[in-house]
């Protein structure tokens, strides 16, 4: 999850998973994994900031885990976001409004990561029922990490996995699930790619709508409609035609 970085070096999803892992051995394991991933995949300054925020989150988990307040639904996400902000606010003050917007989005992702991770790691059914989209958010994190690998000519093999996930959701599930899932996956790809555009979100959502409405239940037609919708959306936007066709 440390590889699923946004805005040039933030790793909020890894920090959220540290918080979701709680105190004790599981929390230590998450901290070690996130720290190792940060050192391997992030710029050095961001790796240090991620490590510092992770240590603060783990320490706060150990300090508060036996309190009633800790069991409240909103406490852990706010705790993780607060610990991350306590490290990042110095850099926000230095870099100005643009960095503040990036940091705010990273804090939101950290809180969502903590909420989804706790639901996924929970042993009780109630937590999973309250957060039915938690597995989707973790899947999104993995897809963002996979799509961060790019070849010299811009080809990212991980984006094929994201498009396959959108196609499967559109084919197997109803529009109430498939379209929000496609939009979230597209937003994750846009955040990971940087640049401030929402091309992936728009094209994935459009393709999910088209497949779900016109060809759901027919594998060949679903694949053809999906490919056509991606081509119609991407090629007029000066996308690299060879890469689009390869995807």
Could you tell me what each predicted segment is?
Residues 1-180, 184-247:
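Membrane-embedded alpha-helical hairpins and interfacial helices in multi-pass inner-membrane proteins
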């Amino acid at each position: 999850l440390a590889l699923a970085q946004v805005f040039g070096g933030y790793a909020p999803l890894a920090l959220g998973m540290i918080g979701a892992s709680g105190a004790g051995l599981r929390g230590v394991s998450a901290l070690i994994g996130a720290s190792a991933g940060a050192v391997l995949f992030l710029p050095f300054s961001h790796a240090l900031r991620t490590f510092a925020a992770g240590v603060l989150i783990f320490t706060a988990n150990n300090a508060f885990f036996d309190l009633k307040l800790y069991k409240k639904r909103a406490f852990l996400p706010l705790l993780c976001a607060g610990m991350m902000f306590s490290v990042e606010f110095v850099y926000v003050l230095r870099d100005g409004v643009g960095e503040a917007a990036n940091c705010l989005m990273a804090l939101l992702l950290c809180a969502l990561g903590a909420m989804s991770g706790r639901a996924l790691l929970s042993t009780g059914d109630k937590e999973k029922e309250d957060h039915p989209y938690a597995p989707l958010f973790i899947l999104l994190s993995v897809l963002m990490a996979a799509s961060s690998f790019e070849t010299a000519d811009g080809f990212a093999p991980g984006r094929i996995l994201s498009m396959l996930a959108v196609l499967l959701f559109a084919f197997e599930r109803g529009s109430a699930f498939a379209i929000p899932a496609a939009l979230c996956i597209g937003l994750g790809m846009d955040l990971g790619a940087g640049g401030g555009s929402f091309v992936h979100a728009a094209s994935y959502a459009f393709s999910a709508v088209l497949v779900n409405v016109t060809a759901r239940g027919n594998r060949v037609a679903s694949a053809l409609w999906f490919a056509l919708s991606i081509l119609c959306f991407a090629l007029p936007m000066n996308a690299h035609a060879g890469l689009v066709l390869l995807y």
